[in-house]
Structures are given as structure tokens and as C-alpha cells.
Design a protein with these regions (language model features):
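Structured catalytic/nucleic-acid-binding cores of DNA maintenance enzymes
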Residues: 1-173
């Protein structure tokens, strides 16, 4: 099961592979995004929050769009891989591919992803706003984590640490 550090590392891999690149193609194999085409969009950022992966995208000029976030959750079995152009995609069977993002220098392939959504960046908090401080986040706040943990003193320590509302990135969902 991917933990917060795995998602953080995955965000760094996608950052190196895609950030600053204009997408040359995209393929979404999830019903809600099946007709979405991000060709021409620029990947402006890659971040993690707990076990959520956020790819920030800038729309091409003149489209009337602005900044959007591609959200995915790895849950128990999801993964993203970056491949060089022409490299064979070998991480998982092809039927598990949910997202393909092509750029000039790399192709990012998301396998067995969950909760894939494309939302305006200004609205991404509705997907991750319930999460507590992220141990690996730039905004890590140990005092806030302690405050959240102490708010429910009758909760067993192990259960409290796994609750993503207290502390994001450790343990379950």
C-alpha cells in the first residue's frame, strides 16, 4: 500500500518528467474524463497531500480556461510511472492504465488510479480540505497535528495516527 512518502516521491518523479512541459497528448480511461483532451496544456506543478497526488495544469491561452488540477488517489494499488519517449510501458498490465499524459520528453502513465478528477485549482480544497497536516508538506505544522490528536483523547493512539483528518500521509486512506 502506498504511504505518504511513496506519494511524495511519485510527485517528485512526475515533477521531473512533466513540469514545464506542454502536453502533446492525453488519454483518460475513466468514464468521467473519457472525452477530456489536455493537448496543449502546460504542467505547472506536481504535489502530494497525504495520499492524494495533484498535477497542476495551465490551459492554453485563449481557451477561456485557467488553472486546473488533475487529482488522483493511489489507495492500495495505484501507481504513476514516467517513461522516456518510445520506452515500453512495463509497470503493470495495460488494462489497469487509467491516465496517460504525453509530453515531449516523457510520458506519464497512471495505473489503477482511484478518484481521478479534473477540477479548477481554486476548488481542489473540496477534495483534500478534510486532511490534517502533511508530514512531508511544505506547510507541515506539528502544533496543529498535536492539537488535532489531542482533541479526541479517548481514541487509541494507533487509530488516531491513521486518521487522515489528524495527520495526512500515515496509514490508511
Amino acid at each position: 500500500m502506498p504511504e505518504g512518502d511513496t506519494v511524495w516521491n511519485t510527485a517528485r518523479v512526475l515533477e521531473r518528467a512533466l513540469v514545464g512541459s506542454r502536453l502533446t497528448g492525453s488519454d483518460f480511461r475513466v468514464p468521467s474524463l473519457a472525452t477530456t483532451d489536455l493537448t496543449g496544456w502546460t504542467v505547472s506543478g506536481s504535489a502530494s497531500r497525504g495520499k492524494h497526488l495533484l498535477l497542476r495544469l495551465d490551459a492554453p491561452a485563449g481557451t477561456g480556461e485557467s488553472r486546473w488540477t488533475l487529482h488522483s488517489h493511489l489507495r492500495m494499488d495505484g501507481t504513476w510511472r514516467a517513461y522516456a519517449p518510445g520506452e515500453r510501458w512495463t509497470a503493470r498490465p495495460a488494462h489497469l492504465i487509467r491516465v496517460v499524459l504525453r509530453a515531449p520528453a516523457a510520458t506519464a502513465v497512471g495505473y489503477h488510479l482511484h478518484d481521478v478528477a479534473l477540477v479548477p485549482t481554486a476548488e481542489e480544497e473540496r477534495l483534500i480540505g478534510q486532511l490534517g497536516p502533511d508530514l512531508l508538506g511544505v506547510d507541515w505544522d506539528p502544533a496543529e497535528a498535536v492539537r488535532r490528536l489531542a482533541a479526541h483523547p479517548d481514541t487509541p493512539v494507533g487509530v488516531a495516527l491513521l486518521d487522515q483528518r489528524n495527520l495526512a500521509g500515515v496509514g490508511a486512506p
